[in-house]
Swiss-Prot record:
Quaternary structure note: Heterotetramer of two alpha chains (FadJ) and two beta chains (FadI).
CDD domains: crotonase-like
EC number: 4.2.1.17, 5.1.2.3, 1.1.1.35
Similarity field: In the N-terminal section; belongs to the enoyl-CoA hydratase/isomerase family. In the central section; belongs to the 3-hydroxyacyl-CoA dehydrogenase family.
Annotated Gene Ontology cellular component terms: cytoplasm
3-hydroxyacyl-CoA dehydrogenase as annotated region, ranges: 306-714
Pathway given in the UniProt record: Lipid metabolism; fatty acid beta-oxidation
Protein name: Fatty acid oxidation complex subunit alpha
Leader sequence segment: none
Domain of life: Bacteria
The organism of origin for this protein: Escherichia coli O157:H7
Coiled coil: none
InterPro entries: 3-OHacyl-CoA_DH_CS, 3-OHacyl-CoA_DH_NAD-bd, 3HC_DH_C, 6-PGluconate_DH-like_C_sf, ClpP/crotonase-like_dom_sf, Enoyl-CoA_hydra/iso, FA_oxidation_alpha_subunit, FadJ
Amino acid sequence: MEMTSAFTLNVRLDNIAIITIDVPGEKMNTLKAEFASQVRAIIKQLRENKELRGVVFVSAKPDNFIAGADINMIGNCKTAQEAEALARQGQQLMAEIHALPIPVIAAIHGACLGGGLELALACHGRVCTDDPKTVLGLPEVQLGLLPGSGGTQRLPRLIGVSTALEMILTGKQLRAKQALKLGLVDDVVPHSILLEAAVELAKKDRPSSRPLPVRERILAGPLGRAQLFKMVGKKTEHKTQGNYPATERILEVVETGLAQGTSSGYDAEARAFGELAMTPQSQALRSIFFASTEVKKDPGSDAPPAPLNSVGILGGGLMGGGIAYVTACKAGIPVRIKDINPQGINHALKYSWDQLEGKVRRRHLKASERDKQLALISGTTDYRGFAHRDLIIEAVFENLELKQQMVAEVEQNCAAHTIFASNTSSLPIGDIAAHATRPEQVIGLHFFSPVEKMPLVEIIPHAGTSAQTIATTVKLAKKQGKTPIVVRDKAGFYVNRILAPYINEAIRMLTEGERVAHIDAALVKFGFPVGPIQLLDEVGIDTGTKIIPVLEAAYGERFSAPANVVSSILNDDRKGRKNGRGFYLYGQKGRKSKKQVDPAIYPLIGAQGQGRLSAPQVAERCVMLMLNEAVRCVDEQVIRSVRDGDIGAVFGIGFPPFLGGPFRYIDSLGAGEVVAIMQRLATQYGSRFTPCERLVEMGARGESFWKTTATDLQ
């Protein structure tokens, strides 16, 4: 049976051809190699019809134009030559669209990304809607690739080289007004008149490209270009630490096109695309993309979720305020905050106001929309307005008795169906539910700080939590824009459990004489966004170290921090950035002064600050402990799958995405090699480096996680 075409042609009475993009059976339009023949057949018809005045590409999907190329096509390529051929096919198709003798216009509503934007760039003009769903960008770099269907050549010529480089190197997505200002689109209109506006543009002569700003014209010349590429190259190298080969190739390919002409540029683009597709970095980044897509589709349990019409939050602190913001402003669910004093409520409301006001100032949000979202948040010092809340999120202090009291109060003041979700980072959910009359409705919902930025949440059912409670909590997390992983109710859950030994080892190296800046720089070079010492300062030394005794009590000596170091730091009133002094010193609040290591930290912890380890040796010690603990978490079924383990580490603590997560990284090294490294470290530094049994067995058998393990390990 022949597949329904993804591209269909209709010619209007006014001789404007409408090409409708609608990939059958899919929510999103993505470009596949097999569509090329469909488009070519349409192009042939267009060329044969001499009456035509213009062409409009439009999507039939309600919220996307084209979300990009189908990434599975790249995975199916076995060699760089195959991937290069794929790019050349895309380039050729775009060239044929561009070569049509009549105006071709892209009518864009919703996501126009990757290959979708490359198709729009091949058109002679672009009109998009003013809807917040409409975004334009080339995110291929986030998959370790570059745009392979002409994007590296067309975009710089349309909007200028410096702006184009920023878009391609970062994967930055533009909203409609930004795209108009930069000349990426010719008009922005309401959704209701998109097609007619595009048709009107198609009836005119081909839109002439707007002259580039003077700055961009200077940068396009040989001298300006040389300076620009030198400066951007240096900045990019600093940002990526040389871990992402795609950025280097993007610079090379764009410069080739500008210096040697588009023919050389297209050739370089296709070659680079093919080579990058075969790199381990791209394979790892694509695995993270697929894994996160799967996690977002995972309902958490087989039971249907309960309705979520309103949510309550206990505690108006930093976490409570952040949770209120993502619940009201991302999920669109009415929120009521309870705090013991009005200042807490005001603090939480101000948090949402500040976030939304920032969007208004940046013109990402209308003031009326801000007010509408803020109206979803209310506050109280008692339980008025809580009687019919579907789910309550508790964000009070880390105190077991207090949290148990919150459970009792919620059961007394809320409905029989109300779910109680605790935002604890360390207390067992089973203990919090110990005295509950409805323990099946108690669950853990662990957010990471800052709530509005961190993409991960851990959902922690205890032994008695019902399947529906799990499904409902997963549903809420997704509505809040989060990626949820369901983890077992064991001390530290997953993320904090693998993070603690990593940070402990960094502190231990400090006591051995390694310098703060050297340790942090070593882990940034390895690929983490910040080093472990800086991370502790950012989280708050008091907050970040609170979990160490809990983990040591549960799992033994391997979780012990160096004796007296943490207490010495805390006794000296060092909490990190929040009070201006930790391992680093910070300038006054509100001022962007550079942080600097406080030299007083070394005598305080009894260290000399004269290290002997190289950066790779520092990174090895921290990372190996994290890998070992991650494997234990699989073994103890703390995580449901290695997929969840990789996503949890990348999204929860910034494990280097180009390595694919702890389990992909172990696979790339080989379990046997990891065991050998850990045994060497155990001989040098002690038994905490002893590889766990599962790793030793896998190493002996030559097994790997991703090739031998199903996605669900249960």
